[in-house]
């Protein structure tokens, strides 16, 4: 497909996100690793391109600022979970937020393979407060639709450990990873519940929950129908 992954789009810090008009669409896929997010994003991208829309796929990558700070013995001692979260949020604004805003200005459809929910869930899993983490990322471009791939911790743990070498599949490692996955899942569920109550997630974006254990083709249809409502005028139905 012509849609490409942007992993390091150049930042433009001179322009503020808040002052930019929105013309494109931002659709994000969230959920645990191995839940089918990438397949959903790729499928929607191909479907949109067949309808003449310009599509760009972005992937939420680990923060380069935090990685460099963690590798430097001089800064490592000061790299608390809160400091790391602040660095990661600033990095995300420059690497992801500003370039996404520019693409929305150009009437492109931006599909994000993980976005703010993932960042928030990771910070909460490291022991930070949910509201604090939500506020940290609320200035990112607001998604027009969040596709939440809802699964269970047990299946996610099995998928993850199955891809690891035998040396890291010990009971202790599995238990520690399981606790992390459970914290991530609890945060995803809390954000989904906030959306259901209209409480912000940190945005007032519609959320479509996709059951990862359901038929993939059925999930793909649900996702396409939700996206179709955003890109096609009311009543202008086209074949799937």
Segments (PLM) and residue ranges:
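A glycine- and Lys/Arg-enriched "phosphate-lid" helix/loop adjacent to the NTP-binding pocket
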Residues: 119-187
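NTP-dependent small-molecule kinase module
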Residues: 2, 8-20, 45, 158-240
């Amino acid at each position: 497909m012509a849609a490409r992954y942007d992993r390091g789009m150049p930042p433009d810090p001179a322009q503020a996100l808040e002052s930019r008009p929105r013309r494109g669409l931002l659709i994000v896929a969230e959920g645990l690793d191995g839940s089918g997010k990438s397949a959903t994003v790729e499928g929607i991208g191909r479907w949109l391109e067949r309808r003449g829309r310009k599509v760009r796929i972005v992937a939420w990558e680990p923060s380069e600022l935090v990685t460099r700070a963690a590798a430097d013995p001089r800064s490592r001692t000061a790299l608390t979970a809160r400091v790391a979260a602040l660095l990661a949020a600033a990095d995300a604004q420059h690497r992801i937020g500003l370039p996404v805003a520019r693409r929305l200005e150009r009437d492109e459809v931006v599909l994000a393979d993980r976005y703010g929910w993932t960042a928030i869930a990771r910070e909460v899993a490291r022991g930070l407060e949910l509201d604090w983490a939500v506020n940290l990322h609320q200035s990112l471009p607001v998604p027009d639709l969040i596709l939440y791939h809802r699964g269970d911790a047990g299946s996610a743990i099995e998928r993850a450990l199955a891809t690891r070498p035998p040396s890291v599949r010990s009971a202790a490692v599995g238990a520690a990873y399981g606790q992390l996955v459970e914290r991530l899942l609890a945060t995803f569920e809390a954000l989904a519940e906030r959306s259901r109550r209209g409480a912000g997630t940190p945005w007032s974006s519609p959320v479509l929950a996709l059951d990862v254990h359901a038929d993939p083709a059925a999930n793909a249809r649900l996702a396409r129908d939700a996206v179709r409502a955003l890109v096609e005028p009311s009543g202008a139905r086209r074949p799937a």
